[in-house]
Amino acid sequence: MEDSPTQSHVLQLAHPPIPIVRIGIIGLGNRGLLTLQRYLQIEGTEIKALSEIREGNLNKAQLILKEAKHPEATGYTGPGGWRKMCECNDLDLIFICTDWLTHTPMATYAMECGKHVAIEVPAAMNIAECWQLVDTAEKTRRHCIMLENCCYDPFALTTLEMARQGVLGEIMHVEGAYIHDLRSMYFAEESEGGYHNHWGKRYSIEHTGNPYPTHGLGPACQILDIHRNDRMEYLVSMSTHQAGMSEYARKRFGENSPEARQKYKLGDVNTTLIHTAKGKTIMLQYNVSTPRPYSRLQTVCGTLGFAQKYPVPCIALDSHGDTPLEGEALETVLTRYKHPFSATIGEEAHRKGLPNEMNYVMDYRLIYCLRNGLPLDMDVYDAAEWSCITELSEKSVLNGSIPVEIPDFTRGVWKKHKH
């Protein structure tokens, strides 16, 4: 479907500069409170409003502001408090840090109220919600960014820089993943930072496929210029059966415990293969219920080079044969192609002693672009494309791993657009 006369694409959308970005945050659980603390470190921001259904969490947030010597924010409580916050006229940007199922409804309402939105991952849970985000962003001409911090991983940025400079040749295949042993977390209480009786755990009881694709997929799509010179066309997906969560529960709680008897639809390991319009491939994995060491893979295969972050950073260049670079040779390449974001903003994060460089670079770039009237690094099409894999991977798994088409959320504009 092409753009209609009354609604056009928002690729490279830019707005007049906002000197001080006035921020509201919806959701002040663990993620929301961390978001609040992060943006107190970013110049040119003002935390104006906070919305949370649990008054105790709202009080925690106000205390964080007080201890940082910032003014108290306007607080909104109750089930409808977030709507009232979206409707106020003294906010520019709203962060949505709530459970997955509320991301899209809140984001679309905020945009309809004239606000830019930044959504925690994933931005949407199904194709219908992905289209709602795209259509609303196009109709309202508001920024809609999904906060995928893994796109700002220093190694991912280095390989992106190498690809942009042609060092890796034509990029043919990319791999990404979310591999993280969360078994103990799934049986820990929320007060302990866990997910017992948490919406994330409930999702694994009711669904299969890949419910959390964006950490691995975001950097992969950026290096392949998805919707900027190519697009994802279709996928096939398959999952193992589920055993890891049940076995862990039996050992910890006993054979006949409610935890051990709980059934899960989500397989232990999901693998999804994606084919692009220009003949490139992406392999995406999800695995949170085995003792497999943490990994996002971050594998890039080009005609002139290879790069992979996990389990240890590895680069091989055609000019050196197929032997991975080591020692000084590896450090020389990593230094030569260090992305400007890492060399400037990332180094600033280190000087400040901040614990997560990826978050700081992402946060800095978002506010920098808004303050300078620039297009954002990630747009609503990224949010839709990366999030839609949740529903589509499940559909493929449940139907014998059949190929499933991936919508073109740009309605054909990707053919005309270069990064």
Curated annotation (Swiss-Prot):
Binding residues for substrate: 178, 212-215, 294
Highest taxon above the source species: Bacteria
Keyword Hydrolase: yes
Binding site for NAD(+): 30-31, 52, 100-103, 120-121, 149, 195-199, 212
Co-factor binding details: Binds 1 NAD(+) per subunit. The NAD(+) cannot dissociate.
InterPro entries noted in UniProt: Gfo/Idh/MocA-like_OxRdtase_N (IPR000683), Gfo/Idh/MocA_oxidrdct_glycsds (IPR050463), Glyco_hydro_109_C (IPR049303), NAD(P)-bd_dom_sf (IPR036291)
GO molecular function, one term: hydrolase activity, acting on glycosyl bonds
Signal peptide residues on this chain, from the entry's feature table: none
Entry's EC annotation: 3.2.1.-
Pfam families, sorted: GFO_IDH_MocA, Glyco_hydro_109_C
This protein's UniProt keywords: Glycosidase, Hydrolase, NAD
Swiss-Prot/TrEMBL cofactor(s): NAD(+)
Family: Belongs to the Gfo/Idh/MocA family. Glycosyl hydrolase 109 subfamily.
Function summary: Glycosidase.
Protein name: Glycosyl hydrolase family 109 protein 2
